[in-house]
A protein has these predicted regions:
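Short beta-strand elements of extracellular/lumenal beta-sandwich folds
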Residues: 864-880
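Terminal connector regions
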Residues: 936-971
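Short beta-strand and strand-turn-strand segments in soluble, beta-rich domains
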Residues: 892-894, 898-916
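Carbohydrate transferase catalytic cores enriched for Leloir-type hexosyltransferases
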Residues: 1-833
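Short coil-to-beta strand junction motifs in C2/discoidin
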Residues: 884-894
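Low-complexity, acidic Ser/Thr/Pro/Gly-rich terminal tails and inter-domain linkers that flank the onset
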Residues: 828-862, 876
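Intrinsically disordered, low-complexity Pro/Gly/Ser/Thr-rich segments with frequent PxxP/GP/PP motifs
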Residues: 907-937
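Short, acidic/polar linear motifs in exposed loop/turn regions
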Residues: 874-879, 885, 936, 952
Length: 974
């Protein structure tokens, strides 16, 4: 039997309340039913973030082709704007969507969604082909309409929908109480009680949870749930006030749940007005399932004092945990609780107080609760719920012999559109989008937008060109087609020529429509296009496609001192966008993958994330015709080579410091630097060109062709790679290809890529002394023999064809390196919820432990007269720090400074902060820039104290002191 279920209640505020929990477990039970069930669920694309979150949760027990989206047209709630034409159109679009899926039976899981949100539940109508049933929970708002339906539009909306319940072929009730409510209020309704259960996830956690509450002299009475009027929480302070003084003093009341603060304040005010101890009222926020179980187990009593409940899940869960429950004798609660000593009149604080006192005074209810627990476990199970539902639905289902013709379905819905005299504006598109995609061919779309747009030849674009070129030669991997794409505006993605030579002609092709069998791979650098791409990537996720982002490095986050000032915030925004839309990340090294994983942990990222990496290719085919053998005539002393763009991150100053000290102490060695002039390289270039050894033992080649590079590698005895941070390390791989030893800074990625070099020595990153020691050891050994031995064996590293195959192995064949899983088990987290990215309060002194170190040789004088240097900030605490705080500017963590004149007088303390870009995790080190503006130098600034500061809170102490007259290099301002 093919069953379709309206899943919009998993997108609205219901998703985190009783209805959402019920429907999710109901769907899981149906999907896992032993019956011949083919279950399908549809979500409303108008609530995009919520649809993606629900889609992710449903994948726990449904396949992608069982989860669908349709596009509603309503933008407001019915109780706010009425039953508008947009809602009528949405009903038509949803009807057409269901007809296209052709289930044997359709089920509306929650009929009262869309009061204050865009949800449009499916109701019976003339165009709908399959029989339609609904789940009926209760009619509490109607029973207490003076409380819940005060406005005429709210009452009209509720009554319109309640009256329509008589047109459903069957109502599935969740308790005997709700079944009787339906019979009483809905004339001619046909219903059955399918009951409810405790989630398997909850039971699994309970069975594995070893937590045992500690013996505590204080007792605890706990309420878990919402605070609206019918929950009757206001009776609890009144009952507490009637307890004996000893119990009042020895008992805490714990309020748990995601509560609006004004409602909590009302409870607190009532508590205080009754003279109850303020310290006895404790508030807990939204709790996870594991936390919930521990709350149940640690409580002496769980309260459920509602005026009316359609079921009583809190009471059921607490009793399954063996905890006494005191519940009102109203609604469906007596069906669950079943012990008279634990039931009370919800209008009597005195009776509630007596029940509390009876249990806290030592009433032995354990035998009764143990017996009831066994009984409840048998009665209320989701397996039984699924069996009951399947039996009830099978009675009214109509089996579809074959899928209907799509054209006939379009004609059918067109009749209803005409009869309803609907304006067709926007409706045609909504109806078209309502039709499920039928093409199940697997496709991998590779974004190359930036490379096509700019035609630059940066490192990233070299990767994009090589990967796209190799993909174009394959065209297909297994059953997956490989397609290069381009997107630069709101129209979406288009197929691009694999040569990447020009933009696609949008007038001769249609934009790509993504489906559940597709994967979108964001290979190119899309930092400047993140906002443009985000909308289309969300649409791809809505339709079930995978979105994989490529991460080259985290340099702008971890070492902003080595970037243009505008780059870190742009990169941060891109990464946030990528984290919102991606189902996975592929990194260009294992080291970067590990850094990403640690970042997700540090911000408590609340979603699952696949993380993989692949090795970039090293293409030596263009060197085949060149002489790659070692030169026969070698220098009488060691020759060292650096290859890479001139920029502060590459560590050229460290290398020059080491050689300066070495040359001064008798080290006889040459240093050749190969690299074009890069960002922030003015001081480095000036230092090289004015160096006394320049042209003698120090050489700089800013541009070389392939043949010259080969000659330089062959003439060298070792490569030096001194970077502070990298995403890869191509020169190390190249050195391995030419068989020369490597001396590298000890960073994880260099450890990783040194597999591509036969012999690598490491020195302490950023330490010229450590580098000099390593150079001396190299020179003191038989360096000629060592270099010769290294050249004999050339380690294997993938070429670009093999690299492309590795990449496909990760994305298509799903050979992921690791999967990040959040610690919290909260469901339905919005994709835009990225965890913790800011401080909302001051960091406690215990969380402020840190170390500051000025990077040697980093002091520079800018051309405009300002001064700049780099500070290494190490988090020595157990708490993650964030550069962002509240919107009013408070609580972000940054480097600040105080300036003093030559006499030690304070000149200035309110200065430009150098912020942590995103998050600085415990044990990690970030390199932050500090800039002193020219005007303060002109006013006599002679020294500086650099210190961590949390804005609006405190300076953290242990400042670094630095004299501004120290050696410096002149840097031009771009």
């Amino acid at each position: 039997m093919k069953i379709w279920v309206d899943g919009q209640c998993l997108q609205t505020s219901s998703r985190n309340r009783g209805i959402g929990r019920y429907v999710f477990e109901f769907l899981r039970a149906l999907a896992q039913s032993k019956s011949d069930i083919d279950l399908h669920v549809s979500l409303n694309a108008v609530m995009a973030d919520e649809a993606i979150a629900a889609h992710h949760e449903l994948l726990a027990f449904l396949s992608k082709d069982q989860i669908h989206v349709w596009h509603g047209m309503a933008s407001t709630g019915e109780a706010e704007a009425g039953y508008t034409e947009a809602r009528v159109k949405s009903q038509m679009a949803l009807t057409h969507h269901v007809n296209c899926l052709a289930p044997d039976i359709a089920l509306c899981a929650s009929t009262f969604e869309g009061f204050f949100d865009p949800a449009v539940p499916l109701f019976p109508n003339a165009a709908l082909m399959p029989p339609l049933a609904a789940i009926f929970y209760d009619a509490i708002p109607y029973r207490y309409k003076e409380r819940y339906l005060r406005r005429k539009l709210e009452l009209d909306t509720y009554e319109r929908r309640l009256n329509q319940h008589s047109t459903f072929e069957k109502l599935l009730s969740i308790s005997d109480f709700s079944l009787n409510e339906a019979k009483e209020l809905i004339q001619g309704s046909r219903g059955t009680n399918i009951s409810a259960g405790v989630s398997l996830h909850f039971l699994d956690l309970l069975s594995t949870d070893a937590y045992e509450p500690s013996e505590d002299s204080r007792k605890s009475v706990v309420y878990i749930g919402a605070l609206d009027w019918r929950k009757n929480v206001e009776i609890i302070p009144k009952a507490f006030a009637l307890l004996s003084k000893q119990l009042r003093d020895d008992t805490d009341f714990i309020l748990a749940g995601d509560h609006p603060q004004p409602l909590v304040d009302e409870i607190s005010a009532a508590w205080a007005d009754l003279g109850l101890p303020p310290s006895s009222l404790k508030q807990r926020g939204l709790v996870s399932d594991r936390e919930l179980i521990r709350l149940y187990k640690s409580a002496d009593i769980i309260l459920q004092p509602s005026h009316m409940e359609g079921f009583g899940l809190t009471a059921l869960e607490a009793l399954i945990c063996g905890t006494p429950v005191i519940a009102s004798n109203a609604g469906a609660l007596p069906e669950v609780v079943q012990i008279d000593e634990m039931l009370f009149d919800p209008n009597s604080p005195k009776e509630l107080a007596e029940r509390i006192e009876h249990i806290l005074a030592g009433a032995n209810l354990k035998p009764k609760i143990a017996h009831l627990r066994d009984k409840l476990s048998q009665t209320f199970s989701w397996e039984k719920v699924a069996d009951n539902a399947v039996q009830a639905l099978r009675e009214i289902a109509r089996e579809q012999a074959e899928l209907p013709d799509i054209q006939s379905l379009r004609e059918r819905i067109a009749v209803q559109v005409k009869q309803n005299r609907l304006d067709t504006e926007g409706l045609a598109e909504a109806l078209a989008l309502a039709e499920p995609l039928t093409d199940d061919k697997k496709r991998l779309f590779i974004d190359a937008t930036s490379t096509i747009q700019t035609q630059y030849r940066t490192g990233i674009q070299r990767v994009v060109r090589q990967i796209c070129s190799n993909f174009s030669e394959q065209n297909i991997h297994g059953e997956t087609s490989l397609i290069t794409t381009y997107s630069d505006d709101s129209e979406g993605w288009y197929r691009a020529d694999t040569s990447l030579a020009s933009k696609p002609d949008k007038t001769t092709s249609d934009p790509i429509i993504f489906g559940p069998s597709d994967t979108v791979f964001m290979l190119d650098s899309s930092w400047d296009s993140a906002k443009v791409h985000k909308r289309h990537l969300i649409e791809a996720r809505l339709r079930g496609a995978e979105v994989i982002s490529c991460l080259y490095d985290l340099v702008p986050l971890k070492t902003p001192a080595f970037c243009d000032a505008g780059m870190p915030p742009v990169f941060r925004d891109w990464l946030i966008s990528a984290l919102e839309v991606s189902t996975g990340f592929v990194c260009i090294s294992k080291a970067v993958a590990d850094e990403l994983y640690e970042l997700l942990k540090s911000i408590q990222y609340p979603h699952s994330m696949k993380i993989g990496y692949w090795r970039l290719g090293a293409d030596f085919s263009h060197l085949n015709d060149l002489d790659t053998s070692a030169s026969q005539e070698r220098n009488p002393h060691p020759s060292f080579l650096m290859v890479g763009t001139l920029e502060p991150r590459k560590g050229h100053n460290i290398v020059l410091d080491a050689f300066d000290a070495g040359w001064a102490s008798g080290l006889d060695a040459d240093l050749t630097i190969v690299g074009k002039f890069g960002w922030g390289a003015d001081a480095i270039a000036e230092r090289i060109k004015t160096h006394p050894e320049f042209g003698n033992r120090l050489h700089w080649r800013s541009t070389v062709d392939d043949a010259e590079l080969v000659e330089l590698y062959n003439a060298s005895d070792a490569l030096i790679a001194a970077s502070y941070a990298e995403g890869f390390g191509l020169p190390i791989v190249e050195a391995g290809r030419f068989g020369i030893p490597v001396i590298a800074s000890d960073i994880p990625v260099f450890r990783e890529v040194s597999a591509g070099a036969a012999h690598t020595r490491f020195f302490n990153t950023g330490s010229s002394d450590s580098l000099l020691d390593t150079l001396r050891l190299f020179c003191e050994e038989d360096w000629e023999e060592a270099a010769l031995e290294t050249r004999v064996s050339q380690p294997i590293w993938p070429n670009w064809s093999e690299s492309a195959e590795e990449l496909l192995g990760v994305i298509v064949d799903q050979t992921w390196y690791k999967s990040y899983e959040p610690e919290s088990d909260h469901r339905f987290r919005s994709p835009s919820d990225l965890g913790c990215l800011h401080h909302a309060q001051p960091v406690a002194p215990s969380g402020q432990a840190h170390k500051l170190l000025i990077l040697p040789g980093s002091m520079s004088k800018l051309e405009d007269g300002s001064k700049k240097f780099t500070v290494a900030v190490t988090n020595k605490s157990e708490e993650t720090w964030f550069g962002q705080g509240l919107n009013d500017g408070r609580f972000g963590v940054a480097l600040g400074y105080r300036l003093y004149d030559a006499g030690g007088n304070l000149l200035f303390s309110e200065n430009l902060r150098s912020r942590i870009v995103m998050a600085l995790a415990p044990g990690d080190t970030h390199l932050l820039p500090v800039t002193i503006e020219k005007n303060w130098i002109e006013e006599g600034a002679a020294s500086i104290e650099v210190e961590l500061v949390q804005d609006g809170a405190a300076w953290w102490g242990s400042p670094l002191e630095l004299q501004l007259g120290m050696a410096e290099h002149i840097v031009r301002v771009a």
